[in-house]
Amino acid sequence: MKNSILEELKWRGLIKQITNESKILDAQNNNDAVYCGFDPTADSLHVGHLMMIITLKRFADYNFKPIALIGGATGMIGDPSFKANERVLQTKDQVEHNINKISAQLKQIIPNVNFVNNNTWLSNISLIDFLRDIGKHFNLSYLLAKESIATRIQTGLSVTEFCYTMLQAYDFYYLYKNNNCSIQIGGSDQWGNITSGIDFISDTINKNNKAAGLTINLLTKSDGQKFGKTESGTIWLDKTKTSEYEFYQFWFNQTDQDSINLLKCLTFLTKEQIDNLIKEHQNQSSKHLLQKALASEMTKFVHQQQGLDKALKLTEAFFSGDLFSLTNDLFKMALNSLPNTQINKDTKVIDALIEVKAASSKREAREFLTNKAIMINNQIIEDENTLISSFDLIQNKYLLVKKGKKKYFVILIK
């Protein structure tokens, strides 16, 4: 473990921008609080949020008191920073539901985090008070110079969204004044909002204050694509939206280069541990040691040991073909994680492949069968006229179709 949080963040290549290094080091020595904001735009966080969740946990490991600010008020508006279009406004009930779900997720991941909801203080400010006590401290030219706002001026920016940065600035002011919170952290798009908060504190409390902030680099893949999106959509932290198995597989399927970067950015493995993994992987790359370490660390962090155990058991069952020994709970996870459909027991294999979307046409299905690329319940299938009723069923009603090395589909027999 490094001597300071800044050393830790630097060797991992995480820092994008920082306002004042010495203030952050002083805050570490004084056991100050640090906060990161999460707007409740959905009822679950996703892997794109992990960079900030893990960074908040890193600060906690270095003597800071972690605060997760849930934007009960700002979530009703939506942060315009670097967004192409204005967000669709959510109802109060939607926001409240999302807050409850997200808070439960974060509490499970970072048990010692202190939750605050900015609706607690922002809802008590009248429009007149907002204009007089907050708005007068923000010069229009100052706000328009912010890159996060300037990029939206041409496409259209409502007054509602325009005020967002002032509300977030007040959040920092409030936590600084009431929670001994001197540090705000955020993603690379939050620099303008963070510096607005520091300027507001300087203007209203004391120019010689201890407020500071830093932003974290955007996580991208080695090919330049934004990290976190897949062909099947968003990878959620909620296991009812993305199962532990799917979550594990998402990390396991990263490239070698991306795995190395992700191990540095998102895990708590030391530099020595990561360097040793890289050496071992280079000597026996077929074992995918980097990917296994990454998938295990991330799944355990989000879903605890129990979730990792489930993911590993299901992964092993798919690899070995021993699906008949799976518990009902694990097979339900497989069913929820894979494309599946109901098919009549008298259906031929060639038609079943199309129905379950393992093939787009009979011609393509025949190609797969000819090339021995189709397995049903771990048995290679070549005859297109085989009836699916001829196979032993898993739990008396399921068949598992494997296409190639990694694609799985589940057939439920009617």
UniProtKB/Swiss-Prot annotation:
What GO MF annotations does this protein's record show?
ATP binding; RNA binding; tyrosine-tRNA ligase activity
For this chain's UniProt record, which GO biological process terms are given?
Answer: tyrosyl-tRNA aminoacylation
Q: What class of enzyme is it?
A: ligase
The Gene Ontology CC terms held by the record are: cytosol
Q: Where is this motif: 'HIGH' region?
A: 40-49
Q: Which Gene3D superfamilies match?
A: HUPs (3.40.50.620), RNA-binding S4 domain (3.10.290.10), Tyrosyl-Transfer RNA Synthetase (1.10.240.10)
Keywords attached to this Swiss-Prot or TrEMBL record, sorted alphabetically, are: Aminoacyl-tRNA synthetase, ATP-binding, Cytoplasm, Ligase, Nucleotide-binding, Protein biosynthesis, RNA-binding
Instruction: Quickly give the catalysed reaction.
Output: tRNA(Tyr) + L-tyrosine + ATP = L-tyrosyl-tRNA(Tyr) + AMP + diphosphate + H(+)
Q: Does the keyword Transit peptide apply?
A: no
User: What SUPFAM superfamilies does UniProt report for this protein, alphabetically?
Assistant: Alpha-L RNA-binding motif (SSF55174), Nucleotidylyl transferase (SSF52374)
Instruction: Show where the S4 RNA-binding domain sits.
Output: 347-414
Any idea where this protein resides? Answer: Cytoplasm
Its EC number is 6.1.1.1
Show where the record puts the motif 'KMSKS' region: 226-230
Q: Where does ATP bind?
A: K229
Q: Which residues bind L-tyrosine?
A: Y35, Y164, Q168
Q: Which InterPro entries match?
A: aa-tRNA-synth_I_CS (IPR001412), aa-tRNA-synth_Ic (IPR002305), Rossmann-like_a/b/a_fold (IPR014729), S4_RNA-bd_sf (IPR036986), SYY-like_C (IPR054608), Tyr-tRNA-ligase (IPR002307), Tyr-tRNA-ligase_bac-type (IPR024088), Tyr-tRNA-ligase_bac_1 (IPR024107)
> How is the quaternary structure described?
Homodimer.
**What does the record give as the function of this protein?**
Catalyzes the attachment of tyrosine to tRNA(Tyr) in a two-step reaction: tyrosine is first activated by ATP to form Tyr-AMP and then transferred to the acceptor end of tRNA(Tyr).
The record's similarity note reads: Belongs to the class-I aminoacyl-tRNA synthetase family. TyrS type 1 subfamily.
| UniProt protein name | Tyrosine--tRNA ligase
Organism equals: Mycoplasma mycoides subsp. mycoides SC (strain CCUG 32753 / NCTC 10114 / PG1)
Q: Which gene encodes it?
A: tyrS
